[in-house]
Amino acid sequence: MHDLKSIRDNPDGFDAGLKRRGLEPKAAAILDLDTRRRAAQTAFQEMQARRNDASKQIGALKKSGGDASALMDEVASLKERMPAAEEEDKALGAEIESILASIPNLPASDVPDGPDEDHNVELRKWGTPKSFAFTALDHDAIGAKLGLMDFDGAAKLSGARFVVLKGQLARLQRAIGQFMLDLQTVEHGYTEMDPPLMVKDGAAFGTGQLPKFGEDLFKTNTGHWLIPTAEVPLTNLVSDEILDEKALPLRMTALTPCFRSEAGAAGKDTRGMIRQHQFHKVEMVSIAHPDASGAEHERMTQCAETVLQRLGLAYRVIVLCTGDMGFSAQKTYDIEVWLPGQQRYREISSCSNCGDFQARRMKARFRPEGEKGTRFVHTLNGSGLAVGRTLIAVMENYQREDGTIEVPEALRPYMGGLEVIG
């Protein structure tokens, strides 16, 4: 959510930020509504003050035996007019809030400009993309040959974009999730959480999924939304809270199922596990001091990178351009892992600094030490990592010519010492 005062103070700057996002200017329309609303507020307040003053005068006249009929007529007229002014104030306020709620976060100054993913900028690479003396297979071909990945059975149960993992492959996915959680909690200091998988409208609004992206979510018949990421419940834990400055940063992590309708993904990644309606992910969330959120963003991204380094998986880090960032982000790093079966890098983590954008929607604040007032916190979120896509990366990078899969050393303690699957 955007600060109306900052739009009043710098409308050109606001429109410039929207232009970088590929959007039309909106400041003038917002400020016109704001002017009309403030006029309605002033009119209502003036009528209210006059009514109160006249009522006192009426009381005094009645006590003294004077004629209060003219004042009584005036008060009656004010009472008739006041509801319309109050209603106009509320209606204009709601219209402003609706517009502000639909506008994405403005990009940070160091985010590269561009309309789409072709304008993202590579920052660094780690590791050498794996090559084989044989033709590398996609993960779905590997899983099918092992008889441990069943898309047909999942389709019979649930339709497209689901999978049933079996035996040691199911165990490997569980091991990956546990390995990630242990790394993020024990070594990186995140507090493990086990949040609800369903949230109310207010939580989905707070992190920016609503009102614009409801079609990307699954909704229950009770009105709850299935979480698309643990970012939603974890971040909203601080909604309507005033935190102590000493408590910052708050770092939380959770391994949860995630649910996405993939409404805009028709025809994309229809084979395999790359794009599923249901998947597991370890999410990292930080609630940070505004002055420290930039450094926290770099730290969070490194925490995600460490997972891939421990697993020996080559990857690259890119900074998303203005046209490819998510709705709530002011700056985003994507981590893309090398998949030999596809001969390309694919996204496995997205780490975003949302500034105070989500905090304003959630009313999440902190009280600076020694000050009476409060400030909005900054919120950050990142995958640490997507478990299913990490499973894909392990399968493709550790495949062997005989169709088996070598278990990375870092995962063997979670697999009972197992070294090879198949």
Swiss-Prot record:
Reactions listed under catalytic activity: tRNA(Ser) + L-serine + ATP = L-seryl-tRNA(Ser) + AMP + diphosphate + H(+); tRNA(Sec) + L-serine + ATP = L-seryl-tRNA(Sec) + AMP + diphosphate + H(+)
Keyword check for Nucleotide-binding: yes
Entries under Gene3D superfamilies matching the protein: Bira Bifunctional Protein, Domain 2, Serine-tRNA synthetase, tRNA binding domain
CDD domains: SerRS_core
The protein's Enzyme Commission number: 6.1.1.11
Binding site for ATP: R260, S261, E262, E347, I348, S349, S350
Compartments (UniProt record): Cytoplasm
GO biological process terms, semicolon-separated: selenocysteine biosynthetic process; seryl-tRNA aminoacylation
Coiled-coil residues: none
Record InterPro entries: aa-tRNA-synt_IIb, aa-tRNA-synth_II, aa-tRNA-synth_II/BPL/LPL, Ser-tRNA-ligase_type_1, Ser-tRNA-synth_1_N, SerRS_1_N_sf, SerRS_core, tRNA-bd_arm
Keywords: Aminoacyl-tRNA synthetase, ATP-binding, Cytoplasm, Ligase, Nucleotide-binding, Protein biosynthesis
Main location as per UniProt: cytoplasm
Binding site for L-serine: T229, A230, E231, E283, S383
GO terms of molecular function: ATP binding; serine-tRNA ligase activity
PROSITE patterns given in the database record: AA_TRNA_LIGASE_II
Residues in the signal sequence: none
Region annotated Disordered, chain positions: 1-20
PANTHER family assigned: SERINE--TRNA LIGASE (PTHR43697:SF1), SERYL-TRNA SYNTHETASE (PTHR43697)
Entry function: Catalyzes the attachment of serine to tRNA(Ser). Is also able to aminoacylate tRNA(Sec) with serine, to form the misacylated tRNA L-seryl-tRNA(Sec), which will be further converted into selenocysteinyl-tRNA(Sec).
Subunit structure: Homodimer. The tRNA molecule binds across the dimer.
Comment block on domains: Consists of two distinct domains, a catalytic core and a N-terminal extension that is involved in tRNA binding.
Protein name from the UniProt record: Serine--tRNA ligase
Record gene name: serS
